[in-house]
Every structure is written in structure tokens, then in C-alpha cells.
């Protein structure tokens, strides 16, 4: 077998699987959805997942690979134990339901005045954030999350209590040409609406 042929086969094998940045998230996903028991999660296995259900996420969670679950619906509730979170939501999810992201945490309770760093990236053209889409379990009054909407040019509908009663979105990144539309929409509970070109992270 030629070296180039071998490289192509290795690359093909590598590309069959989802490669998680966060090893604890990887463990959780393999435990839930590794059907063939090979200790890895293939893209084919991820594509078979529709109902994510309740997921208890680890501390300092990064779940960018959620974007690879291309058939997952919005039947999901993420429970985060702190506000050091980054998650990339796949493009087919366009309505963000009640309790989509729940910050129910000992750390938040102990550090109620500390500003959090949760980043929720929604790749779809979002239509609606429903009641308590983002929620926490106490009067956490400081800004603790940012929303990134790279493909939502028209402001979605925001339920007046989309981020619970106390949550504060410190930054909402939107398409550059839509900043003024979002500002005119008077989205409740958002401190800063910024152009996506100023977002420094990856998605």
C-alpha cells in the first residue's frame, strides 16, 4: 500500500468520528449513544440521535460538538453546574424551549456576585426564545451569559421571561447588518448588542 493511500485511509477513518475537546463531555456522549460499543462516537451514531433529553453537564463544560448532532430536536434540557460553559447548538434547532439551558449550581450560589462566562452559540436562524429558555435557580443578578446568533438576521421573538426573572445577558452578538434591528426590538435583559464581527471565539 502506498503512503498516500495509507494516509487517505487514515484520514477517512479519522473523519468518521466526532472528536471532543472536552473529555468529560465525550465520556457522557459515548455512554449515552455509542451503539457499537467501540468506545467512540461516530458521526453516523450522532446522526441517529433525535431526542437529547436531560443532560447533566460537567464543570467548565465545552460542547462545541453538539453542532454535529444534525438530527437532534429541541427536546433537550442542559443542566450546567457553573457558568464556565461554551456550547454550539446545531442549525436545525430554531426554537429555544423552556429550560433549554439551566444554570442550577452550587458555584453560582456561592459566588452570587461573580460575573459568569457562559457562551451559547446558536447556528440556526432562530425564530423564538420561549419562556425560561435560559434559567437559573436563584436570584443571580449579575450578567452571566452571552448569546451568539451568527445566522439570525431578523430578531426572533423573545418571551418577556426568556431568560427567567433574574438572568442577564451581558452580550448578544448578531449579524453586522442587524445590530440596529435588534436594538430597536428592545430585547429584554440584554446589556450589549454587538456585531458578530467583534466576536472573538469560534463556531
Regions found by a protein language model. Name each.
Residues 34-36, 177-180:
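Acidic glycine-/aspartate-rich tracts in secreted/extracellular proteins
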Residues 34-45:
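Acidic, glycine-anchored loop motifs typical of Ca2+
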Residues 1-14:
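Enriched but not universal
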Residues 15-16, 58-98, 104-128, 138-156, ...:
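Structural signature of tandem-repeat unit edges
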Residues 46-60:
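Amphipathic alpha-helical segments that form the core helices of the histone-fold
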Residues 14-28:
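Disulfide-bonded cysteine-rich modules in secreted/extracellular proteins
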Amino acid at each position: 500500500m502506498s503512503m498516500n493511500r495509507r494516509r487517505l485511509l487514515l484520514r477517512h477513518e479519522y473523519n468518521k468520528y466526532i472528536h471532543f475537546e472536552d473529555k468529560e463531555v465525550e465520556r457522557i456522549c459515548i455512554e449515552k449513544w455509542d451503539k457499537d460499543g467501540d468506545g467512540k462516537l461516530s458521526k453516523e451514531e450522532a446522526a441517529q440521535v433525535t431526542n437529547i433529553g436531560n443532560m447533566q453537564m460537567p464543570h467548565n463544560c465545552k460542547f462545541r460538538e453538539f453542532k454535529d448532532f444534525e438530527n437532534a430536536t429541541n427536546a433537550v434540557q442542559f443542566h450546567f453546574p457553573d457558568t464556565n460553559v461554551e456550547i454550539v447548538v446545531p442549525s436545525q434547532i430554531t426554537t429555544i424551549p423552556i429550560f433549554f439551558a439551566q444554570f442550577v449550581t452550587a458555584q453560582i450560589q456561592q459566588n452570587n456576585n461573580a460575573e459568569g462566562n457562559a457562551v451559547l452559540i446558536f447556528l440556526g436562524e432562530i425564530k423564538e426564545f420561549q419562556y425560561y429558555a435560559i434559567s437559573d435557580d436563584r436570584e443571580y443578578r449579575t450578567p452571566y451569559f452571552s448569546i451568539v446568533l451568527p445566522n439570525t438576521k431578523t430578531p426572533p421573538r423573545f418571551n418577556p421571561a426568556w431568560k427567567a426573572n433574574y438572568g442577564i445577558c451581558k452580550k448578544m452578538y448578531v449579524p453586522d447588518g442587524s445590530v440596529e434591528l435588534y436594538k430597536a426590538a428592545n430585547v429584554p435583559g440584554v446589556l450589549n448588542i454587538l456585531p458578530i464581527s467583534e466576536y472573538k471565539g469560534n463556531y
